[in-house]
Swiss-Prot record:
It comes from Arabidopsis thaliana (Mouse-ear cress). Residues 36-58, 73-99 are annotated as: Disordered. Residues 46-58 have a biased composition (Basic and acidic residues). This is Protein IDA-LIKE 3. Residues 1-32 form the signal peptide.
């Protein structure tokens, strides 16, 4: 019976590993960012935003703008409030110092 479970486990591994490898290869083609960004106020790069690499080859230019795509699975971003105590916390602090 142990040889049967060993064969079954080996069969599962021979099916699972190629599927995982295929999944990793397909996901590695993505760039890892969303298409919509609430905080991104900059426009797409213009010709002056193109950064040349250290060597003198003109045809090898790198754009300083992130390509945005990751299967659309990242959560939408929402504005983060500014840091600091709220009014409620200020009232608690002031009332405790008065007495």
């Amino acid at each position: 019976m142990s040889s049967r479970s060993h064969r079954s486990r080996k069969y599962q591994l021979t099916r699972t590993i190629p599927i995982l490898v295929l999944l990793l290869v397909l996901l590695s083609c993505c760039n890892g960012a969303r298409t919509t960004n609430v905080f991104n106020t900059s426009s797409p790069p213009k010709q002056k935003d193109v950064v040349s690499p250290p060597h003198d080859h003109v045809h090898h230019q790198v754009q300083d703008h992130k390509s945005v795509q990751f299967l659309g699975s990242l959560p939408r971003q929402f504005p983060v409030p500014t840091s600091g105590p709220s009014r409620k916390h200020n009232e608690i602090g002031l009332s405790s110092t008065k007495t």
